[in-house]
């Protein structure tokens, strides 16, 4: 049997694209899918790359087709399917073989599998970029033992996206579940960025009465400036596209109900465990949840009337608001990553993470070069305090405040933008209102509090009033 350099299990959309990418970069690859017909069809449609792909119809034949010590990538659904696949591989692999879970795994599962004493080596690896990225160059975030990563880093460097400076967007993040954790936060930022774009789209459509073509032109113009990014680029394209069945703009024929695979929710939940404030990301998750309640929303409109009213906001103010919101959601994401690094002992390299995200992934953005520089200069400083971003925020916050206040006054739902503004105002207030919370907590629960002076008494004079 012919020998492959590497193997891949799971020929769904992402797995098939990644396998072709690997083959195209000069690494003969063995593939297996639990449904044999899928494997046969994949090989039959591989075109010029078919000679670099070894299709196999049994797991034993798949393992035998890979040159030892083996490296095997799993691209199967997260959760029990991964555990089942690891169990099936166990009797077939040698102790020095390496299995890489490249699916959207919960990092807790990756930690558990890393600590389970598997009889082979194991890496968790986040892959971002969707089908197009997997095929032509994703961003890759590895997690596990450094020596194991070194074994396959040349493959990952070859297949990953390349930043403008030519650097590969692939790196080991840290031990165990670190790679999947960073990918999870990436997805949380993705939720937030998409939601803010949707909110300004709604203001242009419902508040300013702009048609899809005009909105597309605005997005395209923004993509030439500070907001240059994959998500702004595709926003211009989707608003410009026409439905082939009706001729209407594509956004106008799409049901207003957002799907989600759960990684944004995971981010929001884990942030609570880490005491990491990420309100923009949490608002984005909430917005998707609300979008799913179509019947209740329709009933609410019937009872209270349609919410969005005309709201004439200059597109330049929307641009500035979106710039500030984007900085804030990235800042919150990096703060969460920093907290996880400390909690789990991962020593995550924040500038390296920003560099990995510069190309290939869904949240790639021109801002990430400046973020990498700011984090390299001072990784412990919140991004909003880095001079470059502080200047952008100072210039843009008045516009964000205007957009949020006018939009909310006209009945527009702006959960992510408004959450970003509230977070910013809290972050620039040295003395807020938590002293009132502490007094209340001490009144009903004798929880105590810290004082501003040197008095040692940490309880109030509530006595039996509680």
PLM features: residue spans?
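NAD(P)+-binding Rossmann beta1-loop-alpha1 motif at the extreme N-terminus of oxidoreductases
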Residues: 1-71, 93-96, 123, 130-136
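Rossmann-fold dinucleotide-binding core
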Residues: 6, 82-85, 100, 106-216, ...
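Glycine/threonine-rich flexible loop motifs
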Residues: 73-88
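C-terminal substrate-binding/catalytic lobe of Rossmann-fold NAD(P)-dependent dehydrogenases
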Residues: 178-179, 191-408, 413-414
């Amino acid at each position: 049997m012919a020998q492959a350099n590497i193997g891949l299990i799971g020929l769904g959309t992402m797995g098939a694209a990644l396998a072709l990418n690997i083959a195209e970069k000069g690494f003969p690859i063995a593939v297996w899918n639990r449904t044999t017909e899928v494997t046969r069809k994949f090989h039959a449609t591989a075109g010029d790359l078919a000679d670099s792909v070894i299709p196999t119809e049994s797991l034993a034949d798949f393992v035998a087709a890979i040159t030892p010590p083996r490296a095997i990538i799993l691209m199967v659904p997260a959760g029990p399917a991964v555990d089942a696949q690891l169990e099936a591989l166990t009797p077939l692999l040698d102790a020095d073989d390496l299995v890489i879970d490249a699916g959207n795994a919960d990092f807790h599962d990756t930690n558990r599998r890393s600590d389970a004493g598997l009889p082979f080596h194991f890496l968790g690896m986040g892959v971002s970029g969707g089908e197009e990225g997997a095929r032509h160059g994703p961003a890759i975030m590895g997690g596990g033992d450094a020596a194991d990563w070194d074994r396959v880093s040349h493959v990952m460097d070859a297949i990953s996206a390349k930043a403008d400076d030519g650097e590969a967007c692939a790196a080991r993040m840290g031990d165990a579940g670190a790679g999947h954790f960073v990918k999870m936060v990436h997805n949380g930022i993705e939720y937030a960025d998409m939601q803010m774009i949707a909110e300004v789209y709604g203001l242009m459509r419902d508040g300013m009465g702009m048609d899809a073509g005009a909105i597309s032109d605005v997005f395209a113009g923004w993509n030439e400036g500070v907001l240059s990014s994959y998500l702004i680029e595709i926003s211009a394209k989707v608003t410009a596209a026409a439905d082939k069945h009706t001729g209407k703009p594509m956004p106008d024929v799409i049901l207003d109900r957002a799907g989600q695979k759960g990684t944004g929710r995971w981010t929001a939940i884990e942030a609570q465990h880490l005491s990491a404030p990420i309100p923009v990301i949490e608002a984005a998750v909430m917005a998707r949840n609300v979008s799913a309640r179509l019947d209740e929303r329709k009933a609410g409109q019937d009872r209270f009337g349609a919410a969005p009213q005309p709201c004439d906001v200059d597109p330049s103010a929307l641009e500035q608001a979106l710039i500030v919101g984007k900085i804030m959601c990235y800042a919150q994401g990096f703060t969460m990553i920093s907290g996880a690094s400390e909690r789990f002992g991962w020593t995550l390299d924040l500038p390296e993470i920003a560099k990995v995200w510069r190309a290939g992934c869904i949240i790639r953005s021109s801002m990430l070069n400046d973020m990498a520089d700011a984090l390299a200069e001072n990784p412990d400083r919140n991004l909003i305090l880095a001079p470059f971003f502080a200047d952008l925020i100072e210039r843009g916050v008045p516009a964000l405040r205007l957009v949020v206040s006018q939009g909310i006054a006209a009945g527009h739902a702006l959960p992510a933008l408004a959450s970003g503004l509230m977070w910013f105002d809290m972050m620039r207030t040295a003395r807020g209102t938590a002293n009132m919370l502490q007094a209340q907590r001490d009144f009903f629960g004798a929880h105590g509090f810290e004082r501003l002076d040197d008095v040692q008494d940490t309880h109030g004079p509530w006595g039996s009033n509680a």
